[in-house]
């Protein structure tokens, strides 16, 4: 996707440019006519020197048309510049594709280390302020409910201490002894009744067949 750009209508073809002008120089020159998206200078494959021809991609076609009317047949650094709307050769999508240069140790323009193309000494119009990097918006992730997982820790000991066996046996013996003492002090179910039990009226069934019951003293 081109993001709404129309290269066939918003790209200016400029020729007869001074060979010494760099990408950053052209960017500064043509930015007065509108938002410049990309500058491409045609260079020799072997020498990497400028051929004096460049393509200036603007954000909209109105800026491109204003540019051609303003600079066509005008002098720039002692040379008469030719400018027109570029003819689409079918490679528009490739032209507007952003290129990433991962080697930041060398200048794109001169190939020297220690600076980038924005501050290259070969820029005739001086240094250009690098564009601000777009901040990536972080998508808010909906936290998922965490499942509680019960972890069982494995013992690192291969065998148990023999002292633990004797200790557990002693505890079990002591517990059994306490339970035995408690049983001795508990009244048996067939033992003599207390005074409270004697005072309670006993229910005595009638000798004849009936659902009624008699209370005995």
Swiss-Prot record:
Signal peptide: none annotated. GO terms for cellular component: nucleoplasm; U12-type spliceosomal complex. Residues 145-163 have a biased composition (Acidic residues). The modification Phosphoserine is found at residues 155, 210, 216. One of its GO terms (molecular function) is RNA binding. Residues 10-88 form the RRM domain. Residues 120-217 are annotated as: Disordered. InterPro entries: Nucleotide-bd_a/b_plait_sf, RBD_domain_sf, RRM_dom, RRM_dom_euk, ZCRB1, ZCRB1_RRM, Znf_CCHC, Znf_CCHC_sf. A zinc finger (CCHC-type) spans 105-122. Its main location: nucleus. The keyword Cell membrane does not apply. It is found in: Nucleus, Nucleoplasm. GO terms for biological process: mRNA splicing, via spliceosome. It comes from the Eukaryota. Disulfide bonds: none annotated. Pfam families: RRM_1, zf-CCHC. Keywords: Metal-binding, mRNA processing, mRNA splicing, Nucleus, Phosphoprotein, RNA-binding, Spliceosome, Zinc, Zinc-finger. Component of the U11/U12 snRNPs that are part of the U12-type spliceosome. Interacts with ZRSR1. This is Zinc finger CCHC-type and RNA-binding motif-containing protein 1.
């Amino acid at each position: 996707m081109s993001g709404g750009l129309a290269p066939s209508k918003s790209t200016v073809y400029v020729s007869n440019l001074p060979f010494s002008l760099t990408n950053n120089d052209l960017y500064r020159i043509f930015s007065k006519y509108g938002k410049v998206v990309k500058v491409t200078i045609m260079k020799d494959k072997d020498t990497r020197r400028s051929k004096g021809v460049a393509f200036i991609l603007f954000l909209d076609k109105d800026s491109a048309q204003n540019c051609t009317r303003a600079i066509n047949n005008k002098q720039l650094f002692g040379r008469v510049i030719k400018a027109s709307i570029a003819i689409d050769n079918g490679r528009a999508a490739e032209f507007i594709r952003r290129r990433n240069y991962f080697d930041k140790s060398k200048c794109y323009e001169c190939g020297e280390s220690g600076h980038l193309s924005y501050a290259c000494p070969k820029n005739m119009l001086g240094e250009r302020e690098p564009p601000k990097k777009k901040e990536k918006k972080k998508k808010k992730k909906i936290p998922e409910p965490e499942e509680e997982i019960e972890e069982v820790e494995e013992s690192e000991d291969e065998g148990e201490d023999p002292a633990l066996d004797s200790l557990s046996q002693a505890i079990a013996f002591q517990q059994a002894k306490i339970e035995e003492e408690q049983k001795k002090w508990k009244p048996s179910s067939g033992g003599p009744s207390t005074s409270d039990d004697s005072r309670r009226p006993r229910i005595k069934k009638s000798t004849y067949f009936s659902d009624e019951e008699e209370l005995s003293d």
